Amino acid sequence: MTAKLIDGKTIAANIRQQISGRVAERRAQGLRAPGLAVILVGSDPASQVYVAHKRKDCEEVGFNSVAHDLPSDTRQEDLLALIDQLNDDASIDGILVQLPLPKHLDASQLFERIRPDKDVDGFHPYNVGRLAQRMPLLRPCTPKGIMTLLESTGVDLHGLDAVVVGASNIVGRPMALELLLAGCTTTVTHRFTRNLAEHVRRADLVVVATGITGLVKGEWIKPGAIVIDVGINRQTDGRLLGDVEFEPASERAAWITPVPGGVGPMTRACLLENTLYAAEHLHD
């Protein structure tokens, strides 16, 4: 068996095209373009690349993109004041704080300061709580993007044994909520899990988000399973590898996401979707 690739790059491009068309319709109706404010603190090279991609995406679809690039010694109270200012700005529909932040800053406090209706990353406790209560509003971008990738396969998720490897607030925990909502029997594994291989071997669907290159071995994959690899780990030779051993896994799985070109583009596309949703349904 050779797995079919789930092409996140192409699916994300289609989403951007649809959003661009909707923004053009808004402008023709005399409505403003959606606005996204991105806050970048410090000069982390990877963060700078990610933010540049997000700004390019905004430009492509016709959003109003507002950049706030701040020095690494920015104080917590100054960031909170900036968020308050953006909360009150009617031209801004979404506020994004790029992670990781310098160690002296409290990310949780910053996320909670963002108004829930402008929390386009989906990290605010209100939005996570709505997802847990089966009433999602602004959904965390990476899990939301993964659900779109899964929908593209046409596979019925109801009743599947799903295993999420990694329990972060950004991916693992909200991913488990999304899969429960989709009717999966969901297990979350983490750093204290015993015998990870045993859990993965029985999974019809496995989502891996740990940041550990090749953590999940190809031989663990159940024949015919769906494999979603969220990891993107740069090697010393410049290659980008995922958290799953791709080649042997693709010989056993029915569907698999590539790294790069799988989950990453979908996270960015869903950020745009959330911003458009906030503009049209929460702010217009």
Curated annotation (Swiss-Prot):
In alphabetical order, the GO MF annotations are:
methenyltetrahydrofolate cyclohydrolase activity; methylenetetrahydrofolate dehydrogenase (NADP+) activity
Task: Give the record's keywords alphabetically.
Answer: Amino-acid biosynthesis, Histidine biosynthesis, Hydrolase, Methionine biosynthesis, Multifunctional enzyme, NADP, One-carbon metabolism, Oxidoreductase, Purine biosynthesis
Residues given in the record as NADP(+) binding sites = 166-168, 232
Show the catalytic activity.
Answer: (6R)-5,10-methylene-5,6,7,8-tetrahydrofolate + NADP(+) = (6R)-5,10-methenyltetrahydrofolate + NADPH; (6R)-5,10-methenyltetrahydrofolate + H2O = (6R)-10-formyltetrahydrofolate + H(+)
GO-annotated biological processes: L-histidine biosynthetic process; methionine biosynthetic process; purine nucleotide biosynthetic process; tetrahydrofolate interconversion
Sorted alphabetically, which InterPro entries does this protein's record hold?
Answer: Aminoacid_DH-like_N_sf, NAD(P)-bd_dom_sf, THF_DH/CycHdrlase, THF_DH/CycHdrlase_cat_dom, THF_DH/CycHdrlase_CS, THF_DH/CycHdrlase_NAD-bd_dom
**Which biological pathway?**
One-carbon metabolism; tetrahydrofolate interconversion
Recorded coiled-coil stretches: none
Q: What is its EC number?
A: 1.5.1.5, 3.5.4.9
GO cellular-component terms in the record? cytosol
Give the highest taxon in the source lineage.
Answer: Bacteria
Q: How does it assemble?
A: Homodimer.
Protein function: Catalyzes the oxidation of 5,10-methylenetetrahydrofolate to 5,10-methenyltetrahydrofolate and then the hydrolysis of 5,10-methenyltetrahydrofolate to 10-formyltetrahydrofolate.
Which family, according to UniProt? Answer: Belongs to the tetrahydrofolate dehydrogenase/cyclohydrolase family.
Its name, as the record gives it, is Bifunctional protein FolD
